[in-house]
Amino acid sequence: KAFLPMMLEQREGCIVNVSSVFGFVGFPAQGAYNISKFGVRGLTECLWSELAGSGVRAVSVHPGGIKTNIEIAGRRCAAAGEEESRLAKLGEKLLLTPPAECAADILAGVERGDLQIVTGNKSSTLHWLSRLLPDRYPKILRLLTG
């Protein structure tokens, strides 16, 4: 909101909104997180139309599997028990992409003019799974996550 008027006046700029691969797929036990990330994606897609012809672009970034402390910081409580422990173990297996690699992917995507940038371990797989098999991917996710 603060920078958009200036970008519109200059007829150039790029708004980069960070969503998540969970902005494409509804992941088990992540409902609140999914809502926020689908929302970021929806806002960005709305901006594609609203900014058309203005010289200003909007990009949604969908990282996943980035090796940060998000899984540890996002733990809810010990009372969540077995489900929490299972998700923590899954996170250890999937959070493999270094943050610097993710940042490089984002910069490259912005420079290419991409509207969506999908980066990180298994993120492209989940993205295409949700697009090509929208009625089947939830079952596949359940099988993969145990």
What are these regions (language model features)?
Residues 36:
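Active-site helix of classical SDR
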